[in-house]
């Protein structure tokens, strides 16, 4: 597991139905930009708000559209091992060979339980499939600890890596220290990817990226430069990308009739908002996700403008593939209509 994998959004029509034509276009765009692979139905793909039939239709079409060109990884994690088993079986039957399993959320199992009652049963039930645990305690409220990940990878050789999204570098270092030699660590946080790869006590081998939905070529080049021992190029690309990496989640303070509050627009809301502005297939998010505030959307636009002003070449693949003028779209307010709430 090396390189840049895109945590793909799920494009939707205005009525909230799945946009498979848009999905095909996005996958073709990713393929042309030579990413290492695609994660279908992760957090960015809005897996919590798609029913299993929709979930599997996205996995199926992604696998068909990608063919042999891209490594497809299907998210089938749940907080119910039986449900995850059924989803995993269906994904494997559709031809997917690699599965992303998020730690069980909400019901709060211990790390021991996560290992013994979730990851190990699933990995053993499907010995011909590869599994990647996805550790993101900010979403799940629990986490597989490095010690249990090390035991898991020893007991189950089809655990082929980890998506690490704790934001905790000491946790990442513990994974590297405890797990088998060359065990792949993939960044789950765009802002931290280069630091994770460059740190000799972590040595991440790539990323599962949100920003790659928009700028797959540049994210790929950054990751590959670091893998190819060209840290200066990697740093230059990361510096150019940083404003967009900073808007995967957008925080704003908002005035309400009852006082001032903090508003946090979480992934994929900001990413889909920007993709809509740029003229890429994205559409709305599924409820209970909704829209950004005006202040949040302005932050997104300003970040994109900043990147465009310093590195317009980053956006050339979008302009060529989707036949759009990025500079015009980032300054024409008609492209933003309806993408944010009118008031709090």
Residue ranges, per PLM feature:
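A general structural signal for well-ordered alpha-helical segments in protein cores
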Residues: 23, 59, 84, 119, ...
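A generic alpha-helix structural signal
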Residues: 27, 59, 88, 176, ...
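Catalytic alpha/beta core domains of metabolic enzymes, predominantly
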Residues: 121-129, 136-253, 263
